[in-house]
């Protein structure tokens, strides 16, 4: 049985700001863009959360909820530097580290002999070492499988940890809300709720074939998670799945021509990011994203094995068909990156087709 730890830093960006600027401590703060520039909250501290402020919320709305909220501009270079220090701490205990972002990661400590081999004690030691090195607190979840470790890390925040032992799994997942499963967002959660599926026990009793027919491959994943199954290993060299860029506009725009005026800069920035972080990867789709002034969003995608500027403009036109008179506050473009397993499967299929053509 594996021993998996999920480490999640507590309100990371905001915590770094409070560490570096002590005068911010005890006050509601948020890291994000200015409200007069249509900024969005990246993260906020617990004082701000008491007022209902949340990540991804418009800064202007956050200020309405909490008029005394202090907006702090992000310092990404500092956050990356501290993140590197945190990952160095992880390496003191295991080489099997799967970063999910700057402030969270999975660790497989199954073979770690420190702390008597106890994952619970290892998590405590990691959190203490992070605090001594950076002055920041972290929360941890400990479980035999990844998705439960991630859920557990959120159960005793801030600066705490929660353990799910193997014999606890059946009872734990029985009453677990499906919305808590990583990958089940608001949209999927609503679809599940519409067919009477709220908890994992509800899903356990649902016909498997019907679930797969409705949700495809993700239906199979849901069936496994509802039974407390997750066979994924820690991936130290986790493949990036996409590269994208988006911009929140200073004012709502409404016409195709206005949107087209924003596209060249976005596409140029996307090209730069692809060269920087995915130049050797294979592209398999292009995506255009719009967020409207009611904060609902839509995406349009199309298969593509190379970046086509024309395709981005075609997708933009299709996305605007869903506008329904609403103003557009955000526009984004991205590409999906094929995984190595996808490429291998495609190559194997090509070989099979060639063999069939040759009469093998």
Swiss-Prot record:
Residues recorded as binding Mg(2+), renumbered to this chain, are 8, 103
Q: Which GO BP annotation is one of this protein's? A: DNA-templated DNA replication
Annotated site location: Substrate discrimination: 13
Q: List the Gene3D superfamilies hit by this protein, alphabetically.
A: 3.30.70.270, 3.40.1170.60, 5' to 3' exonuclease, C-terminal subdomain (1.10.150.20), DNA polymerase, Y-family, little finger domain (3.30.1490.100)
User: What Pfam families is this protein classified in?
Assistant: IMS, IMS_C, IMS_HHH_1
- Cellular localization per UniProt: Cytoplasm
Q: Which residues form the active site?
A: 104
Q: Which domain of life does the protein's organism represent?
A: Bacteria
Cofactors demanded by this protein: Mg(2+)
Specify the UmuC domain's residue ranges: 4-185
Q: How is the cofactor bound?
A: Binds 2 magnesium ions per subunit.
Q: Does the keyword Secreted apply?
A: no
- Keyword DNA damage in the entry? The reply is yes
Alphabetized, the UniProt keywords read: Cytoplasm, DNA damage, DNA repair, DNA replication, DNA-binding, DNA-directed DNA polymerase, Magnesium, Metal-binding, Mutator protein, Nucleotidyltransferase, Transferase
Top EC class of this enzyme: transferase
The record ties this protein, via InterPro entries, to: DNA/RNA_pol_sf, DNA_pol_Y-fam_lit_finger_sf, DNA_pol_Y-fam_little_finger, DNA_polymerase-Y, DNApol_IV, IMS_HHH_1, Rev_trsase/Diguanyl_cyclase, UmuC
GO molecular function terms here? damaged DNA binding; DNA-directed DNA polymerase activity; magnesium ion binding
UniProt cross-references to PROSITE patterns, sorted A to Z? UMUC
**What family is this?**
Belongs to the DNA polymerase type-Y family.
In UniProt terms, what function does this protein have? Poorly processive, error-prone DNA polymerase involved in untargeted mutagenesis. Copies undamaged DNA at stalled replication forks, which arise in vivo from mismatched or misaligned primer ends. These misaligned primers can be extended by PolIV. Exhibits no 3'-5' exonuclease (proofreading) activity. May be involved in translesional synthesis, in conjunction with the beta clamp from PolIII.
Q: What is this protein called?
A: DNA polymerase IV
Q: What species is given as this protein's source?
A: Shewanella sediminis (strain HAW-EB3)
Task: Tell me the organism's taxonomic lineage.
Answer: Bacteria, Pseudomonadati, Pseudomonadota, Gammaproteobacteria, Alteromonadales
């Amino acid at each position: 049985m594996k021993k998996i730890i999920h480490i999640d830093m507590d309100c990371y960006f905001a915590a770094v700001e409070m560490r570096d600027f002590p005068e911010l401590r005890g006050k509601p703060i948020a890291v994000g863009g200015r409200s007069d520039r249509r900024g969005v909250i990246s993260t906020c501290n617990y004082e701000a959360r008491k007022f209902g402020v949340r990540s991804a919320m418009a800064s202007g709305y956050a200020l309405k909820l909490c008029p005394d909220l202090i907006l702090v501009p992000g310092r990404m270079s500092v956050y990356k530097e501290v993140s590197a220090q945190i990952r160095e701490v992880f390496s003191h205990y295991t080489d099997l580290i799967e970063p999910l972002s700057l402030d969270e990661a999975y660790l497989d400590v199954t073979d770690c002999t420190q702390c008597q081999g106890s994952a619970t004690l290892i998590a405590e030691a990691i959190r203490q070492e992070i605090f001594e090195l950076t002055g920041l607190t972290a929360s941890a979840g400990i479980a035999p499988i990844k998705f439960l470790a991630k859920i557990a890390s959120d159960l005793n925040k801030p600066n705490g940890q929660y353990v799910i032992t193997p014999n606890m799994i059946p009872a734990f997942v029985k009453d677990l809300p499906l919305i808590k499963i990583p990958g089940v967002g608001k949209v999927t959660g609503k679809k599940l709720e519409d067919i009477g599926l709220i908890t994992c026990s509800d899903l356990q009793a649902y016909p498997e074939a019907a679930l797969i027919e409705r949700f495809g491959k993700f239906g199979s994943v849901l069936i496994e998670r509802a039974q407390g199954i997750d066979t994924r290993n820690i991936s130290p060299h986790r493949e990036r799945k996409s590269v994208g860029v988006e911009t929140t506009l200073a004012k709502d725009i409404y016409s195709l021509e206005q949107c087209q005026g924003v596209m060249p800069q976005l596409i140029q920035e996307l090209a730069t990011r692809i060269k920087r972080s995915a130049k050797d990867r294979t592209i398999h789709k292009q995506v255009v994203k719009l967020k409207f002034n009611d904060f609902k969003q839509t995406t349009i995608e199309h298969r593509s094995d190379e970046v086509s500027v024309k395709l981005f403009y075609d997708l933009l036109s299709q996305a605007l068909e869903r506008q329904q008179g609403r103003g557009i506050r955000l526009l984004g473009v991205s590409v999906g990156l094929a995984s190595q397993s996808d490429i291998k499967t495609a190559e194997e299929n090509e070989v099979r087709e060639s063999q069939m053509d040759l009469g093998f």
